[in-house]
């Protein structure tokens, strides 16, 4: 099994938290990310949320945009 970092796991937890706060499914979030120009499937969203896939700076930018949050919100403990 691939090792993950605390930051990767933290981002996954926050993505799931904000997705659920918005009442979205993983499929809903994937669709919104695609509209924003970031091609992530539901499966990739699931891997990010479970901490098994790192996110790029571009993807982080798009999560912030789609959720309508700040970078501080995403990285806050």
Residue ranges and their predicted role:
Residues 23-47:
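Short alpha-helical DNA-recognition segment
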Residues 52, 56-73:
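DNA major-groove recognition helix of helix-turn-helix/homeodomain DNA-binding modules
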Residues 18, 32, 48, 77:
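Residues in the recognition helix of alpha-helical DNA-binding motifs
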Residues 1-22:
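A short, Lys/Arg-rich alpha-helix, primarily the initiator
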Residues 2-6, 31, 65, 72-77:
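Short, charged recognition helix plus adjacent turn
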Residues 20, 34-35, 50, 61:
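Residue-level detection of the helix-turn-helix DNA-binding "recognition helix"
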Residues 15, 26, 42, 57-60:
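Helix-turn-helix DNA-binding elements, focusing on the entry/boundary residues of the two helices
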């Amino acid at each position: 099994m691939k090792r993950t970092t605390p930051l990767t796991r933290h981002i996954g937890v926050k993505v799931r938290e904000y997705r659920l706060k918005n009442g979205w499914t993983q499929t809903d979030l994937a669709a919104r990310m695609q509209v924003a120009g970031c091609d992530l499937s539901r499966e990739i969203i699931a891997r990010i949320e479970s901490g098994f896939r790192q996110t790029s700076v571009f993807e982080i930018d798009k999560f912030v945009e789609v959720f309508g949050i700040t970078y501080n919100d995403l990285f806050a403990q």
